[in-house]
Amino acid sequence: MNNLVFPECKEIIEEMKLVYTHDSRPWLVGFSGGKDSTLLCCLIFEMLKTLKAEQINKKVYIISSDTMVENPIVKKYMHEMNSLIGKYGKGYLIESKVIYPEIEKTFWSCLIGLGYPTPEPPGFRWCTDKLKIQPLNNFVTDTINNNGEVVMLLGVRKAESSYRARGIKNREIEGKLLIPHTDIKNAYVYNPLTELPNEKIWNYLLSGDALTPWRSDNKYLFSLYQGEELGEEQSALGQVDENKMAITGNSRFGCWICTMVKEDKSLKRFIDNGETWLIHVN
């Protein structure tokens, strides 16, 4: 991928390099398999490639969370990507791992075994904490116990329509780029993609041969988002498949059992695109 064509991503890589070489704290990267976390991991690989061997001196953990009630197609893809990242990242001290909820905190253990009511909108949502947040926090805490402190990289974005220049020469790392975690002591949060708009994400991922550093095809990832309803930021990549509408790529692939929504739109799209085995049993 040519970073000269994407100066925003080049600047993010330079900023990442500054943060990475600042200290010896290991990085923890949340990877869901979606477009944002895929881009984040791509840029981490690209950054590490620019370093000398002696500068690569700490672990980068790529962490995927399997709730055990994921959409089967998304789950399979996430596991495959996590494994490939670990395989191709060994030379950069990248270690991939899939984490799971404790058996007594799984969705079915809570719902059937403990008699929890089903999660309901607007705010009764115990599932996210038990299935995703707690397993991740447990891994973070264990890593802190072994290393003292950690830096957590997240692929969250403001999704602004215009990109704000990210000058790094005069930016402080502590308290500016790295923010103390609100709940976990000795954990610091770094959000390098904050200002990157949607169309830049897809333009970068689908540039050139559209392959990731771990040799997966981003065109397949793009196909998982096909058919998403248009939003404020229309993707400039509708021409990827002229037979399908342009998309924003904003969709969230939820759990197949989710009771927080009336209709699982992502599941419906998979069914409409031929995955009829996903149709609910009557």
Language-model-detected regions and their locations in the chain:
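Nucleotide-activated chemistry modules centered on ATP-dependent adenylation/adenylyltransferase
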Residues: 1-28, 37-282
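Conserved G/P- and acidic residue-centered "switch" motifs that form tight phosphate/ATP-binding loops
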Residues: 34
